[in-house]
Amino acid sequence: MRARSHPGEGFRIFEIALVIVFLLAVIAALFVNPSQGIGVVEARPSNETIQAYAYAMPAAGWSPLTVHFSAFGSASRLGRIIRYEWDLDANGRYDTDATDQAGYTSYMYKKPGDYTITLKVTDGQGNVATDAVTVRVRYPGSSSVDYWTVFDDSQVRRVELRITQANWAAIWQNPSAKKRVEADISLFGETLESVAVSTKGNASLEATPNEKKSWKIDTNYFIPDQEYRNLKQLLFHNNFADASLLREKMAYDMLAFAGVPAGHAAFVEFWIDIVDDDQPSEYLGLYTMVERVDSKFVGNRFGRADGIGNLYKADAQPVTGAADLAYYGENIGSYPRPRGADVAYGLQTNLEQPDYRGIINLCHVVDGVEYDSPQAFAAALEQVFNVDGYLRYLAVIFTNLNLDTYPYTGNNFYLYENPTTGKVEFLPWDLNNSWGHFGGDATFPLYGQPCCLGPLQWAPLFTRVFEVPQYRQDYSAYVDLLVRYWFNRPDITQRVAGWQSLIGPSLTRSTGDKMYVGPGAMFTPQQFTQDGLALISLTADRADYLRAVLDSGAWQSEIPKANTRPVLIP
């Protein structure tokens, strides 16, 4: 949590020593651990004349790391702020004057480490306030996976699956069964033998009308401990129903920009070689290769010194329930089971000793207690949950209109019990429905709408978090930074043009991408270009709407209440 510091009155110590002691005690009560990166939730004392708020985006990442800063919400009761100064390199000096930019500035951190960055604001009466935010820069070599080689997104590389006719036919007997069969795979010129290949997906698997399904490769299914550059599973998504092919990739990039722990993604061309049919390799089309959320993912983001904590994958189905983060008691057996035997929070790690106490405790804090005030709820929540990470996630999904997740459908996310902090982390997943593909338009409200669009009928975390005034401000500050530096017409135009230039040739490679050419094609190559232009238009309109809301001060309003609590169907 970010520490808020307040201006002193300049009294001489020898005159009011007892008063100073009292004031220091009060101020100390407001200080919290700065490494968490969120604001305190206590209401601003009535005798404060000036308040500073410092925000960073991202607040953590791999070096070299460019961070954008804002003083969103900083204000004086005696007039406007006339000076914004930053200590951006943590050297103790305010050597960056951002007054001309109303407090906005940027800085690149090349050296790994934790930096305490301080903002100082001054009003026309000479009153001063400061605020600090921590930026954590990680060394790429500390990762167990060379992400920058495996997920090199500066080029489109070739992946070729080499499989027998019998095994290929076995997949197509029932694609929905996701049967694993043996094959070899060439990844960017490097071959792995005897991997397991299977289809993946749910709705997209059923609806894709040709062989361009999404694929999952398990490297160690037939050969124990076999890995590809320290990865055991490789995922290739077909970008079903996205004519632009860009939604998922750009959504992951946007999350990374916001400082949300999200997977890497890169474009590849996927080929199939039936090794015993005397025919050349067949081109399926362009895919997005996406990093899997697993023990290595969380270890590389949150560390391994204290072991790997419990990782849960959220699930949802109509009628039978969803991962709603509601409290159903102390027995995990009482919680929703969307697919019958499996609980909505599917344990992915530490399977030898299944333990759901962390999830139950989080649900209890979120939904099982009546609090005296939003501030009391916030104090309890921050003991068990990384609120700042969740607010950054919400800022991204409500800005780019990805409604196929919490707080609407109740799936497409993970929860991780971080053993280092003792808090639960919220991790996004499956982002192909971003940019309004699952609903929402340019004027979708800043704080969203009452849930729900699918299986989820009750989203207490969504409702309660936005009842806290400080959280609404922090969230709005993150939306502001996104709109200013990433989600706007100039930046998105450059991104769409760059990606389309890179991947456009892959649509007509060989016999053509099966999503665009041949039997079962869902789009035309012209729609690829048109949908990219539509993404630009939606982004521009959405950014204009959000900017108007932020500038008007309407961000201080509360969100609509969620629907009533559901009754589980056995």
Question: Model regions: which residues?
Answer:
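N-terminal Sec-pathway targeting helices
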Residues: 6-19
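Extracellular/lumenal mature domains of secreted and surface-exposed proteins
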Residues: 34-142
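Low-complexity, Pro/Thr/Ser/Gly/Ala-rich linker/spacer regions in secreted
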Residues: 38-51, 136-149, 552-570
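N-terminal module-boundary/linker segments of secreted carbohydrate-active enzymes
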Residues: 140-180
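Middle-to-C-terminal accessory/interaction subdomains
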Residues: 148, 156, 167, 171, ...
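Conserved oxyanion/phosphate-binding beta-strand-loop segments in alpha/beta enzyme cores
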Residues: 181-238
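Internal "kinase-insert"/substrate-recognition segments embedded within catalytic cores
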Residues: 214-224, 236-240, 260-263, 275, ...
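Short, well-structured beta-strand/strand-turn elements
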Residues: 258-271, 405
